[in-house]
Amino acid sequence: MLTLKAVIFGAIGTISETSELQRQSFNAAFAEAQLDWHWTAQQYRSLLLTNGGQTRLHEFRDADPARHHVSDADIEKLHEAKTRLYVQLLTGAGAVKLEPRPGVAELVAQCLAENIKLAWCTSTSMENVGSIQTALNGQLPLDRFHTVVTIDKIKRVKPAPDAYVYALAQLGVNADEVVAIEDTPVSISAAKAAGVYCIATPGATTAGQDFSQADRVLADLTGLNTEQLRHLLMMHLTAPMTSHLTARKAKL
């Protein structure tokens, strides 16, 4: 019998809008390293087509010969500085407080009440996850998520399916028993590569990108409940069977 056993939240932006804070942290790291790099909001939107902060740094450097003097070791240090500055923004004096995206807290609460397992399937560090939990100030019970996937637990970042394969194993469920929620095309590719039904909720910095791989696109999770998720999953899983039966009847 088809059933919904788990909901997987993907990238950080599915939980809370943090991309602008991350952009500011990258720029602060560049300034700290005395680099004349500065990412505008428009540039960062384009960079988000690639997953993983270090990968973005590598791609940005490699795109212009004038930046090739920055070594791989320098990039690693830049990313470490960005993480430190980002964590300070969320946990230090005068820390920024985050809000869950619309509908997230309600859906999480309903899943917990119905014993539907929860996972957070990121490509970020555990340090970043911890700082986000602090900045959410108890608004989301992330400690009750069955598993949180971080960069140290996988070999390849999204769009590779590694994070989802790991999450499914930790949850003890099959891909066809899960709904994923993602906010970037590259992360959706990872979910689909793992065979997981995926709902896209584009964020402030990813709206307008190509979400055609998603099974469904929503502005946010407002009003979305577990009964609707079950229905969407069932319709998705039975669609090939229905199409096959219809085609067979037509032949007869």
Regions found by a protein language model. Give the residues of each.
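Non-catalytic, surface-exposed connector residues within folded enzymatic/regulatory domains
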Residues: 20, 38, 69-72, 98, ...
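Residues at secondary-structure transition points
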Residues: 73, 77, 95-102, 123, ...
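N-terminal helical cap/lid subdomain that shapes the substrate entry/recognition surface
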Residues: 2-102, 109-114
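N-terminal-biased segments
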Residues: 59-65, 117-125, 148
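Asp-based, Mg2+/Mn2+-dependent phosphohydrolase catalytic module
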Residues: 2-4, 109, 125-127, 131-252
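Active-site-adjacent beta-strand anchor residues
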Residues: 16, 119-123, 181
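Substrate-recognition element of Asp-dependent hydrolases with the DxDx(T/V) motif
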Residues: 26, 95, 104-134, 191
